[in-house]
Amino acid sequence: MCGNESIKVLKEPSENFPFVVINKPKGLASAPLREGEDCALTQAIELFPQIKNVTGKKTVEYGLVHRIDTATSGILLIATEQDAYNKLLEFQKEGKFIKTYTATVYNPENKNIKTVVQSRFRPFGPKGSMVKPVFEDGSTADLKKCGPKFYTTRIEISGNKAVCSIAEGYRHQVSAHLAYLGCPVEGDKLYNPHYAGEEIMLFEASKIEFTNPVTQKNVTISL
């Protein structure tokens, strides 16, 4: 493990709950690029080796149901049984796996906003390190370079606090949609033009909601 960047177990797996729920700290990757690299998943496997019984989207990701960016802290869900993992992927495709993020945002006018932002995305910035939301009235170049799928973020902003929920996520989706609204995340070096170079990104994956495939009961886990 690296420094103080260690996961915290929020919920352990059981017969009726074949998942591990962890709180990932900022600065720790969700998944490894190569087997055994220090990351949230590797640390979880050290505690719960049965995670390796699951075949995931990528071989080294095993039962990891979803990722959050390295700079983001918060909740991750990891399956310990294949059937449960497969079912959760189906729920994600059906929009039944809801992830909520909370953020401190730049909002000097103290605007109160409640809206839904829906867009496609295209790579943007140096070496495609960022994404740009693309809307129906976008430029010809943007419309050519964006993907075909639309992604939706439900956003509520009150002062400098934002709560954002998504059912299906794209890379940097929430950060890019908040920046589009003129309320970028404080400490976001990619999407906040006011970033001064030293701030910590104030962004957290604070809640997940899904149906437990074993019990068919709704589950809500929050920080």
Language model: regions and residue ranges:
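RNA pseudouridine synthases
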Residues: 1-223
